[in-house]
């Protein structure tokens, strides 16, 4: 694959461009947490032109959890291998002209890879907090959305040689023990 990642496709969340510099560096290093996505809208051809620059390959609009039509909430708790824990909760209210939603998505794992000769963590911790509010008056509406993302991933861009992969595909080289990605939003 090309190092340009998604440069030929415009990525959006709720109609807002995701790429930090869509005209100069359209490749996306951020991608919304899939657990928060309610639906996906795909635009191809002339319909994608209104989505902004870099739409040669089309546009993808990821639509987050909507404000509910009536007061409701949801809680999902999952546990898995390698210390995986995922919590997804939301609560929304709607009363006539006003609606609001709070959503939390927390996901962590100890990781499944091993770092050769030194050990160490290969997992991640990712936490999303989203607040939405909407006010409607006649033919007009005002919407507000706030999103806070925090992520620490003990991952590396360094791959394995074919020989190392054949021996153990879940191993990482010892020199990658200090590789860490931190995103605080």
Where on the chain are the PLM-derived regions?
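Flexible glycine-/small-residue-rich
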Residues: 2, 13-15, 44, 64-66
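Short acidic/polar hinge/loop motifs at secondary-structure boundaries
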Residues: 9, 16-44
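Short beta-strands and strand-coil junctions in structured, solvent-facing domains, enriched
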Residues: 18-20, 46-50, 109
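Outer-membrane beta-barrel and related beta-rich outer-membrane complex signature
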Residues: 23, 114-116, 143-175
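Outer-membrane beta-barrel domain signature
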Residues: 27, 47, 51, 76-78, ...
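Non-catalytic regulatory/gating segments with a bias toward low-complexity or hydrophobic composition
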Residues: 40-41, 60, 102
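Flexible, solvent-exposed coil segments and beta strand-coil junctions
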Residues: 64-72, 105-114, 124, 165-175
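Transmembrane beta-barrel wall of Gram-negative outer-membrane proteins
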Residues: 72, 79-108, 117-156, 183-185
């Amino acid at each position: 694959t090309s190092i340009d990642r998604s440069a030929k496709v415009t990525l959006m969340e709720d109609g807002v461009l995701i790429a930090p510099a869509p005209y100069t560096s359209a490749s996306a290093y951020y991608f919304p947490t899939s657990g928060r996505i309610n639906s996906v809208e795909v635009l191809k051809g002339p319909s994608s032109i209104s989505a902004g620059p870099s739409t040669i390959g089309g546009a993808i609009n990821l639509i987050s959890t909507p404000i509910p039509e009536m007061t409701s909430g949801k809680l999902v708790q999952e546990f898995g291998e390698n210390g995986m824990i995922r919590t997804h909760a939301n609560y929304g209210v709607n009363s006539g002209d006003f609606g609001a939603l709070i959503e939390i998505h927390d996901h962590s794992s100890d990781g499944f890879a091993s770092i050769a000769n030194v050990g160490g963590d290969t997992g991640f911790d990712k936490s999303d907090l989203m607040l939405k509010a909407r006010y409607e008056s006649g033919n007009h509406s005002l919407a507000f959305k706030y999103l806070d993302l925090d992520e620490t991933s003990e991952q590396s861009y360094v791959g394995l040689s074919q020989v190392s992969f054949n021996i153990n595909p879940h191993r990482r080289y010892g020199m990658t023990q200090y590789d860490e990605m931190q995103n605080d939003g």
